[in-house]
Amino acid sequence: MSASQPAAESRNSAQVFSGLSDAEQEVLDAADRFARQELYPLSRRMDDEEWWPPQAFPLIGRTGYLGITAPPELGGAGMDLFASGLVLQAFGRWNHALALSWVAHENLCLNNLLRNASAAQARQYLPALISGAHVGALGLTEPGAGSDALGSMRTTARRDGDHWVLNGSKLYITNGPVADVLLVYAKTSPDKGAQGISAFIVESAFPGFRVAQKLVKMGFRGSQTAELVFDECRVPAANLVGEEDRGVRVVMSGLDLERAMVAPLCLGIAERALAVSLEYARTRKQFGQPIANFQMIQSKLADMYVRVEAIRVFTYQTLRAANDLEIGGGGRGGIHQLTAASVMFAADTLNQVLDDAVQIHGGAGYIWETEINRLYRSIKLLEIGAGTTEVRKIIIAGELLRG
């Protein structure tokens, strides 16, 4: 967003503390209203039944919350990564499972294609992703390639005339069971290791592609996850993204942006946990008075507030820095270190926030059907996905020592 910073007196105290401009606050508030009205009512059934609401993405697209970073000529909003992070923050408050699917579609697939695909590929695939007619996903992780996703990658692609033929499998793929378009990484020159990886646009309708199994998760239920199989999957040669054997640049740049975009999801969940805990503390009575009157509960609420605000500051700082990431950039240097630090801190701190939130709720927090339990079951993923906490520490330390 390029809106100039307004005078401080025209802004509320929350904006002053967060550093949001009026235009940015409007993006956050509008997304919050939409998510509360349209997405929150879906959250309980999504968790209970592992249900995917097929109407959700078309509705989100019609409302203008897909293709945030895409140009208007493709149907997008023409905004920046920071605005996209604000939308994710709002969605995370009200339906964190759908927010996870949204960011896999919006950032891992759509924005990745926007940054790396050719103009012809963008014209072919982005409009349907922006409208919500198609769901997007990214295929990187494999059964034997998690933290070592590049070095241990086994999925291959060989050239056969006007097609590439993919063989292998991908695991833990968000949106996998419902995706129409996927950005998939495969080794085109296996002897070159990580330097022999290429990126491809794969349609779920291509021969040889199938969903092997839908995976049932502890948390983020309703956000669909699957193992995908490529069995002589024929992909048109025109669907190679960028240059052959240069996919590692797409991977590393995308991972830094992915980490920058996990933190706003953590922030939204943390904000909701604090709000729900405040409401519970005010209404739950023991010993003839609200438990909010007890100093131990007040201590937990104070700790939660401090941690939420710390996540907010770090998240916004990182999003603003990631706004300037050039195409093909990242995977090294200050932004690589910062995005790893941001998501490590946000996920770890969110864990502390939710631990206090469940304790405030007491027995109710341990019951599956409560909202706070729904949040608590989900947050472990954020210490695993987009690089585990341990990998994040390796990145941070590596950049420190190189400096």
Predicted regions located by residue number:
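A short, Trp-centered hydrophobic/proline-enriched beta-strand micro-motif
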Residues: 132-141
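Short Gly/Pro-enriched turn/cap motifs at secondary-structure boundaries
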Residues: 129, 144-148, 172-175, 189-191, ...
